[in-house]
Amino acid sequence: VTLSGGRPDGKEAYVQSGVLRASQRKVAKGSTELLPLHTHLAQDAEPLPADEFVEARVEIFPFAHVVRAGSRIRLSVHTPGGDRARWTYILADQPNGATFEVGHSASTPSRLVLPSVSGVTGYPSSVPSNCNALRAQPCREFEQYENTPAE
């Protein structure tokens, strides 16, 4: 998953990512709402069932980011393929291709849980005018996207 922020100036900046192989979704004792600890044990691996929604909790790695008034938050769910400049993953071969659906309705809800810190001061009141001013935080034009069901 990739978390990005839509800025008030119409740009979108990368915030942070999280990775989970869905077959390794079993969480261990000691997990919390903000920190799902996965067992990653071979005996706990379980393929995704066909035509059924299951919970897969993905940790978004620690970060600090100021969300200013007028900003948006976007969570993109994707397979870990060649969408990273420096990191790639060896994906299991899927002879018939692979698709996944993310529930986003009352009967199959999804949620994004983020920690919040109040009372922090000292950060600029506006975003940097140079979209790529923050190191390792690429930025681009924000493109509106609407979730649609797979056909």
How would you label these PLM feature ranges?
Residues V1-E151:
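Glycine/threonine-rich phosphate-binding loop and adjacent beta-strand/alpha-helix elements that clamp
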